[in-house]
């Protein structure tokens, strides 16, 4: 008798994806983040579903409904804190996952990489709309400022912004539609993640050496299921510690004040995971230029497969490119710090230098380093 998991139409799909999948024998802990992102998505969908049962998307009651969840609903404070900090965990795993992809040259799997970029945009859109829902000060002003950026689009900008708002300012219609989109997008993300996996399993996983591993494969289960489980346990311990001990560590105190259109907060800034892009936006004194740079700061990831000049795929044996990679990581951290600072000297010039460096490293220095390393290999 054949094993059921290999013959049953549904179980066969799961089997090929998570059990009998041939995986490279040498992939490291950096390959854990895919499964951890799946875990984050599940945490967010489940906690979000329970929050949606008690939340009201109305400008008059949204803020008090969140307060009601925290005070009156059984374990509501826990669900809310899990959902708010789950977004931070999601982005930590996401950025580490992308960093891994850049370091080990995983971007050469074009379809997987491009679906990943679409996923990044979807997650960012979902997180932004979710931040608006509690209807605190930073929710309202963040929504106003970020949606207003679309008015920089020539000719159709103003109409587009008013169409998104559903009126002439961020109001009840905006909150309502943001709630609707925030609810549906995670399911679209889950579907896209399936496509992401589908394309990945067409080619098989990359590995730290960046060389074909067809001659040395091991089954995914039990080797990588146990390895992923270890990652899950570590992440859940860290996550639970953050949620239970310092749930407001990554949030903005301004969001504990109800939204007031007549009172602008001293520093309008998004959540920490958008600060690097926000810093790039602010470092250009032209509105349209800033918006273009903001979009390009993420879209530039799509160029990686096209600007690789090195003969070796991974950065494991490429010291010059390694240096530039870690310089890029440091640069993104500096941009994140600058994004949270007020617009005044010396932060303005630091942000501008860091923004130029961000694009320079990716578009010029890394391809040049690849060519130099090719020459060094021939010596």
Curated annotation (Swiss-Prot):
Residue spans crossing the bilayer: 33-53, 77-98, 113-133, 178-198, 226-246, 288-308, 320-340, 347-367
GO annotation, biological process: mitochondrial electron transport, ubiquinol to cytochrome c
What does the cofactor field's note say? Binds 2 heme b groups non-covalently.
- The answer to whether the entry has keyword Transmembrane helix is yes
Q: What residues does heme b b562 bind to?
A: 83, 182
Q: Where in the cell is it found?
A: Mitochondrion inner membrane
Looking at the UniProt record for this protein, which Gene Ontology cellular component terms does it annotate, in alphabetical order?
A: mitochondrial inner membrane; respiratory chain complex III
Task: Quote the record's binding site residues for a ubiquinone.
Answer: 201
Topologically, how does it sit relative to the membrane? Answer: Multi-pass membrane protein
User: Can you name one GO molecular function term for this protein?
Assistant: ubiquinol-cytochrome-c reductase activity
Sites where the protein binds heme b b566: 97, 196
Looking up Gene3D superfamilies in the UniProt record yields: Cytochrome Bc1 Complex, Chain C (1.20.810.10)
**Entries under InterPro entries matching the protein:** Cyt_b/b6_C, Cyt_b/b6_C_sf, Cyt_b/b6_N, Cytb/b6-like_sf, Cytochrome_b, Cytochrome_b_C_euk/bac, Cytochrome_b_N_euk/bac, Di-haem_cyt_TM
Q: What does this protein do?
A: Component of the ubiquinol-cytochrome c reductase complex (complex III or cytochrome b-c1 complex) that is part of the mitochondrial respiratory chain. The b-c1 complex mediates electron transfer from ubiquinol to cytochrome c. Contributes to the generation of a proton gradient across the mitochondrial membrane that is then used for ATP synthesis.
> What cofactor does this one take?
heme b
**Keywords of the record:** Electron transport, Heme, Iron, Membrane, Metal-binding, Mitochondrion, Mitochondrion inner membrane, Respiratory chain, Transmembrane, Transmembrane helix, Transport, Ubiquinone
Other information: Heme 1 (or BL or b562) is low-potential and absorbs at about 562 nm, and heme 2 (or BH or b566) is high-potential and absorbs at about 566 nm.
The family assignment reads: Belongs to the cytochrome b family.
How would you summarize the oligomeric state and partners of this protein? The cytochrome bc1 complex contains 11 subunits: 3 respiratory subunits (MT-CYB, CYC1 and UQCRFS1), 2 core proteins (UQCRC1 and UQCRC2) and 6 low-molecular weight proteins (UQCRH/QCR6, UQCRB/QCR7, UQCRQ/QCR8, UQCR10/QCR9, UQCR11/QCR10 and a cleavage product of UQCRFS1). This cytochrome bc1 complex then forms a dimer.
Query: Organism, per UniProt?
Result: Microdipodops pallidus (Pale kangaroo mouse)
Is Cell cycle among the key words of this record? no
Please identify the protein, giving its name as recorded. Cytochrome b
Where's it mainly located?
Answer: mitochondrion
